[in-house]
């Protein structure tokens, strides 16, 4: 690495070291705080449009994004809703609910004011529809980074600590990992001037292979780049018979935790005891806490067994219950966290 690059990364590390509290919780007696991901309410916001299917909704979001959310509650009031309905004090916005507002600085400043008025932290913004950061064509990658940059400006107005990006791409996994890491480093540097970190989530396809995503993040050298491990997004494809292929979620989260700046507690369905049926939250939160993570853990309910409001509350109760159990047991490190390997396999 050239001396100029070393100096540049060193300066960035200083910036993010000073700003660490923006993505970590304030000093409390709790092991973690709970945030609410706006996508937990996607059926509430999209209403009849989501019932018509994702193809219909995707087209509407491209052609008339304001109409897509016109029938539900105002997305601008999300922070207020989080506080008044659930008494949750931190939120994770989703940009697709605001596609029609990109560039409208007054709109996002007003959202920030509403959040402040209700004592709600604008933790992060999840970005969709911004292009392929792992594309082979350099021009396409550049266009994608410009789209991300535009949304980073909106997240900055909200007072967010970070943005979550997607890293779609193509080509051989090794080369794609290298291209993607370079895009992430560029975005990480852009984020320095905005006070924003850039995080990547396991979000389907190759990104749901925990070893591959850990490889990408180990190649990315910027201190403002990290991960957002999601408890449930580990479906990596389908087999010849059309059955889903899943990466082991506990191993995947373990591999991503060394890079974590945020965590997403995905939930779908609950048993009579209030436990999530697909993910053992006790085991998963042990992995998270053993990594030394003490930031926000975001509720992201995507089930249909309960309505979205009840699903959020069920996830909230489960997180609170497990947190209380670990707190009373003086949680100790068990060494469960798996460090990122440099190799990865696509057939796991």
Q: For each predicted feature, which ranges?
A:
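N-terminal pre-domain/capping segments
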Residues: 2-157, 175-178, 185, 192, ...
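Acidic/histidine-rich catalytic cores of soluble enzymes
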Residues: 48-49, 90-91, 181-287
